[in-house]
Amino acid sequence: MEDFVRQCFNPMIVELAEKAMKEYGEDLKIETNKFAAICTHLEVCFMYSDFHFINERGESIIVESGDPNALLKHRFEIIEGRDRTMAWTVVNSICNTTGAEKPKFLPDLYDYKENRFIEIGVTRREVHIYYLEKANKIKSEKTHIHIFSFTGEEMATKADYTLDEESRARIKTRLFTIRQEMASRGLWDSFVSPREAKRQLKKDLKSQEQCAGLPTKVSHRTSPALKTLEPMWMDSNRTATLRASFLKCPKK
């Protein structure tokens, strides 16, 4: 699974996921499913935000990468992916600037057009079950919830899906492709079922013991499917900005 994640996702997303797991004391070598889930969630958050801007008239517009316009403002503020201290600093700044009610839990995004925080969910289960779990945890009508599944289903607060159909279809297609690629490598069942994941981990550990000391040959080739799977959605200028702000090392 770890190899799949490193081949499948944008390097910046992998780096952010590693940082997040380290912050919470989790070992990505053991919690490989969580590593994959975090990367998937991060990518959906970035895809949700990318190419969406607010023009000088306050209208929401879509601008593809490479169309420069200094008067445009990003519609969404990305909170997910930042360390907790910085994330809360961003949330507090948004609340002070916009007058929005401070959420009890860290949300994933802030929508400057609708003036609301957004909680993004990506589930391997039924969307309505995961939606209810999120709603019960957040207990706030102010935070908008939007859930996506790997089967193309989605559910949002008051059936308000925020994004246009094409943008949402892009996210659904990406999730479905990830599922198909996992399945083709025999990874999907263990990703869905914790019990299956434990069984697979024991099997892997046992096979590692049996193979200890044997010469190994590692292939670094990328399959044609994974070449097309690699996301090309990120705005290159914004990628550089995000990398600088999200991955900045604290001064000693």
Swiss-Prot record:
Phenotypic consequence of residue 80 to A: Complete loss of shutoff activity
Annotated signal peptide: none
Site positions for Important for efficient shutoff activity: 202-203, 206
One GO BP annotation of this record: viral RNA genome replication
Function, in words: Plays a major role in the shutoff of the host protein expression by cleaving mRNAs probably via an endonuclease activity. This host shutoff allows the virus to escape from the host antiviral response. Hijacks host RNA splicing machinery to selectively target host RNAs containing introns for destruction. This may explain the preferential degradation of RNAs that have undergone co- or post-transcriptional processing.
Family: Belongs to the influenza viruses PA-X family.
Record's comment describing the protein's domains: The probable endonuclease active site in the N-terminus and the basic amino acid cluster in the C-terminus are important for the shutoff activity. The C-terminus acts as a nuclear localization signal. The C-terminus is recruited to host protein complexes involved in nuclear Pol II RNA processing.
Name listed for the protein in its UniProt record: Protein PA-X
